[in-house]
């Protein structure tokens, strides 16, 4: 791990999209996507795009394989087949500039539509066509009950050209299979889930400097074995200065009722009030202060297998 730094404070980000499989494996290594020293910060917003209907789903004891999953489509636009939204807010709205925006989307199993073509609408204007790069597409490469994919697109130019870049962002046409998989023959206990995350880096000259690095890749996790996901290439401050790190993520197939799914960084078990140590991936959208994000549509407490959020990484020995 490099230890070169130019700033007093260091900020570490990983943007992960995880899948599910009958066995654990690192399919696509995590490599840097964005790496820059910034006086500013990051924000991650997102939402799921599957559910029984367009309403918020708040039955927290339900597994997604027992739900007849259909596209959420909240935009009242007949040209889209799926859509959901989330609001972008910046703490100091009078002194900032967005310098990078990366859009991620994926599903446990893709639908019949294109997985690389989605649409993004900001607080002002109309939908913009977005063509993504495939991070991973299982297609027929693995066996089991799911064939996950994940895609990425740099949407900085789209957001930079908006008249107003704070407010509601809507992502449409994320492709996913649909149905209640527990009723399939043969039985499928995995279920379907899908969603999107928008990762924002912004400058604010009143804030301390940070080294911000984002990584993406694809790892499939299972309930039968632990999986180590190696990540390297980020910078930290030299000793003895304390390292302060945050961790951003997106994941698929983290049913809220399923316990004992853990996330550890350097053997430190991550947890917050809304992400317990024994149920880290719990179908929720959370922010840095560990609370659930409510300014999204639909505003579900159970996102039926989709997780995204940001949290502080505990570093008690430094």
Where do the PLM segments sit?
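Residues within well-ordered beta-strands of beta-sheet-rich folds
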Residues: 87-89, 97-104, 119, 152-154, ...
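Primarily extracytoplasmic ectodomains and periplasmic/lumenal surface modules that are beta-strand-rich
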Residues: 93-100, 105-113, 125-127
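Cysteine-clustered segments with highest specificity for TGF-beta superfamily mature ligands
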Residues: 123-189, 276-318
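Helix-biased "structured C-terminal domain" signature
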Residues: 28-43, 48, 194-318
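Extracellular beta-rich ligand/substrate-recognition surface
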Residues: 62-83, 142-149, 217-225, 252-254
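Bacterial Sec-dependent N-terminal signal peptides
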Residues: 1-27
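A short beta-strand-loop element at or near the start of a globular domain
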Residues: 55-100, 171
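Solvent-exposed beta-hairpin/edge-strand motifs
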Residues: 110-130, 263-268
